[in-house]
Amino acid sequence: ASVFAEMLAFRQLVDSQTNAESRRLLLAGKVEDMLNTVVRQIAFHNFETELHQARAKAELTADEISDIWMETQRAALGPAIKTGDDYRPIWGYVPHFIHTPFYVYAYAFGDCLVNALWQKYQLAQASKTDHLFIENYKNLLKAGGTERYDVALQHFDLDASKPAFWSLGLDMISGMIDELEGLK
């Protein structure tokens, strides 16, 4: 709920800007934040998965853990981002790996879920059916944690087991990048 409310406030703030540079700065910050939330957290999850698989076979040294870290981060970052030896121990600063293992996926999941909901909201506004979306959204908030997420998403015609759900969420990020690039 808080991330959806953030998006409402963010969109209002961006849309109220009359200066292209202000819009650009806001959009660039939001895109960076969204990419960090989705791409970075998935990379963290991949690290945890690889780490635990390797640990199931043998005890690992800090250097071996750092090797796994570098391998998974380079795979996520691609060739455009260069990581040096100073990046090797960074895994040690992420408390989730110790205190709440395998939790980081929730950040990426939550962000993509909200992005998909936001896209549905935008479509509802465009088709003048936003009152139905708002009613469903209020019911979602009222339900709190009493419904499983898959049941709750059905009210919005969303199914997280389908690739289209994830594409919808990622398309929002792509659209925001396009909007940012369109500001000359």
PLM feature spans:
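C-terminal, non-catalytic "cap/extension" segments appended to globular domains
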Residues: 4-8, 12-16, 20-21, 30, ...
